[in-house]
């Protein structure tokens, strides 16, 4: 019976699907595809692929990532210690639109969060933003205000780095486009 268990059976759960609408698939390590559904466990190295659907992932450190229609997100690794509220999080947004909302890892040690697109690396300092990647790899990144359940909003900061250099974004709805690996 043990021979039929997948790698995910032995891995640590790093989050779960907290919103599911329409068509989406989670590709596990080793190539197994699992149809997305509410409360489905998510593991490091999973890939989220949406068709005509949307998925939101709630990570163990309270980070939230929304993956919209026709998008692809590759989770590299998430490590989290709830006692110290520290760890690391890294993933790649490859296609489509993804919204990121910071959890505890970004709030306690922002340098431990690494988010990549085909043309940029984003450093997070406790905030929300969206990134849209088109079919040729161009990345559009927009900083968003973070609001709590009482409607209190603040704007954090992100850095966007490419081969051309780095910019700091700290104004609500500030945007940048990175067209190719060598542009800013």
Model-derived regions: residue spans:
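Sec-dependent signal peptide recognition
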Residues: 1-3
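Outer membrane pore-forming secretion/assembly proteins and partners of Gram-negative envelopes
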Residues: 130, 183-184
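N-terminal signal peptide c-region/cleavage motif recognized by signal peptidases
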Residues: 6-8
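Flexible, surface-exposed loop/linker segments and immediately adjacent secondary-structure boundaries
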Residues: 11-52, 56-166, 171-175
């Amino acid at each position: 019976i043990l021979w039929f268990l997948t790698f995910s059976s032995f891995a640590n759960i790093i989050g779960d699907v907290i919103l599911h609408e329409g068509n989406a698939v989670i590709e596990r390590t080793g190539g197994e595809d699992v149809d997305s559904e509410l409360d489905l466990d998510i593991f490091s190295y999973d890939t989220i692929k949406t068709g005509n659907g949307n998925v939101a992932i709630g990570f163990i450190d309270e980070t939230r990532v929304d993956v919209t229609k026709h998008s692809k997100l590759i989770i590299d690794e998430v490590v989290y210690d709830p006692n110290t509220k520290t760890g690391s999080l890294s993933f790649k947004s490859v296609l489509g639109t993804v919204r990121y909302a910071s959890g505890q890892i970004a709030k306690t040690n922002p340098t431990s969060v690494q988010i990549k697109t085909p043309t940029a690396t984003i450093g997070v300092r406790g905030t929300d933003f969206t990134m849209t990647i088109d079919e040729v790899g161009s990345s559009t990144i927009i900083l968003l205000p973070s609001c709590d359940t009482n409607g209190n909003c603040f704007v954090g900061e992100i850095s966007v780095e490419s081969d051309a250099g780095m910019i700091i974004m700290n104004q609500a709805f500030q945007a940048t486009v990175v067209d190719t690996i060598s542009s800013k």
